[in-house]
Amino acid sequence: MSDSTAPSAHRPRGSEDFGVFDDAKTYYASDERHTGRFANRTRTYSQSSLIKQIERLNLPEPFRRGSHDESNLEQGRRFLIQVDATLESLKAQEDTDGNMQITIEDSGPKVLPLRTAASAGYHRFEVRGTYMLSNLLQELTLAKEYGRKQIILDEARLNENPVNRLSRLIKDHFWDGLTRRIDASSIEIAARDPKDWTDDPRPRIYIPSKCTAQFEYYKQVALDRPEIRLDVQLLPEVITPEIIRDMNEKPGLLAVAVEEVEEQDPVKGTIKTLRGLPFVVPGGRFNELYGWDSYMESLGLLVNDRVDLAKAMVLNFCFCIEHYGKILNATRSYYLGRSQPPFLTDMALRVYEKIKHEPDALEFLRRSILAAIKEYHSVWTGQARLDPTTGLSRYCPEGLGVPPETEPSHFVHILQPYIKKHGMEFDEFVRAYNHGEIKEPELDNYFMHDRAVRESGHDTSYRFEGVCANLATIDLNSLLFKYETDISRTIRSLFDDKLVMPEEFCQGTPYKPGDILTSALWDRKAKRRKLTMDKLMWNEEEGMFFDYDFVNKKRCTYETATTLWSLWAGLASPKQAADIVKKGLPKFEEFGGLLAGTESSRGEIGLERPNRQWDYPYGWAPQQMLAWTGLLRYSFNEEAERLAYKWLFMITKAFVDFNGVVVEKYDVTRPIDPHRVDAEYGNQGLNFKGVAKEGFGWVNASYVYGLQIVNAHMRRALGTLTPYPTFIKAIEQLNEKALADLE
């Protein structure tokens, strides 16, 4: 395995050389690369069916292995490969469980001889080990997708430093694989809803009442392409829980931001049309814009210089706030009443720092801050989510009845006693209950908390079961403190302490068009929230913040990693931060990074009390990234580096051992197969054939973001798959030797 740690360290290109680490499209679409100067030397490789059978059965060949007689080793070894035959041999020999992946769990010999390009296929060199063979499977799968029958493959793509390889895949492939835009080019697929369980599922899009240009655009698409059966609906100006409920009979995609562009029409010449602003989805099966996933993804996009995508997602968020009143859980009709953890101010400020040299940068930031102000008032401190006694906020989305996006059978065990009580069939009861014809306060309470859990982004966890809407959570109130301080600082430093409220962002706020906002107002809000949280949520003895139950007027005891969000937001005092690091952090730190919650808080599990995915023993990318950033904010650099190293090591090890896998969440207590998750939703990102195309959005981001946290020595150690205890022991020995040399 190469020990280089940066793309610049890869071998240089010669005059006849191509980019060894080019993206797959560039690498496999080039005829010259794969047929050029070797084209007249490949006849030796055209083997009889007998030799192909020998390859397939892995029998000894009458040829010697020309392992070290390459004529161009200084340029790097290359293999001359017949794609289909080699792929067939590789799968037959190495993919012993038949899942189109080569992992440490396959029992093949883990060695495959390949013909060398320098010998025109006469000599061979053995490719060995799970990592190289799984990379070979991935490369051959890609080559086949690009229509190649024969390729010249650089060995460097097979033994590439895994940190470099995963970083490269994220930058060159995964982000593109997860990028969507909603317009005529994608509407047929994007507007189909896998959760449409009605009798007539069809593509459907809802347009905000004020977006007449989009409405006309999609109506024309429907007229031009009747075969796709696109249903275009205009939303009412005011959207109530009753309207959201009734829309469940016709679920659909919600329109997002577009831009006007010019394109060439073969008949009309240059015409103006609409094009959707792009956004990144969490995983490959999604086609809608998501809430806090988008913020987490933006952290990685900015590292990879994809400012265009991060900026477009901010603009999409502003569009959602202006037209739907909130940043939605996701842009589907059944999510119109539900938001997700708010990160808009930090996201916009990070993008602004990258584009502030551009002429429209300040206007971009102005609209983003105004949208955040509207969201702050109309959503998070609005009547539904604000506890007036404490002044703290909770997750509590609007909604009536049974959440429609779940499988119809999901709530059978909850509803069965009520169905029996009323002597009704399942569907009959759900319809009557949803429309208020049956009153069941206990059931209302259950679904209020269920919707709140989904809005929290932490669905599901025993932390929230049956109580979520009663809680002022440490995570939400830390985020709102960050909104307050971000808005205050931005108004003061960039808008001369005067920000004028325009009409489009006044709805749901206490402001009128033309009102001038100053930083002092937002400073007071932040100070008041900080004082209240210190009083109600801080536990001096435990050295942590806890959720506060304002119904029962008591502090909760569930230990959650979101206590570290107080560092990310700058809410914790220096002493509180030190206490959290000293007393709290050790409770969450595991082999692979931070746990979402502690084992003692989760409690015993069994058949009647199964695992929940946001509890022990699982770790999630958002918790890691916010913790690293928060620790660095308070100068706990060593702790941030250690946690980042553990998370990155776990991801890299699974990537190497399990055919390039990158998944939604990990069991941070499992050293061998942390991507295996035994929780209610399983794990996304596992079921690919041959090669992973997208990874998972916020894990991709955490990887490239985390590599900015660790130092160069750590990055080199990650490339050689050095576990953290081994790494830190070696560092300590080096330090001891250095001290001894000084004496």
From Swiss-Prot:
Its Enzyme Commission number(s) read 3.2.1.28
How do changes in temperature affect this protein's function?
Answer: Optimum temperature is 55 degrees Celsius at pH 7.0.
UniProt keyword annotations, A-Z: Calcium, Cytoplasm, Glycosidase, Hydrolase, Metal-binding
Identify the residues that bind Ca(2+).
95, 97, 99, 101, 106
Q: Name one GO biological process term.
A: trehalose catabolic process
Q: Which cofactor does it need?
A: Ca(2+)
Q: How does activity depend on pH?
A: Optimum pH is 7.0 at 55 degrees Celsius.
The subcellular location is: Cytoplasm
Give the Gene Ontology MF terms in alphabetical order.
alpha,alpha-trehalase activity; calcium ion binding; trehalase activity
- Stated family: Belongs to the glycosyl hydrolase 37 family.
Name of protein = Cytosolic neutral trehalase
Q: Which organism is it from?
A: Beauveria bassiana (strain ARSEF 2860) (White muscardine disease fungus)
- Organism ancestry: Eukaryota, Fungi, Dikarya, Ascomycota, Pezizomycotina
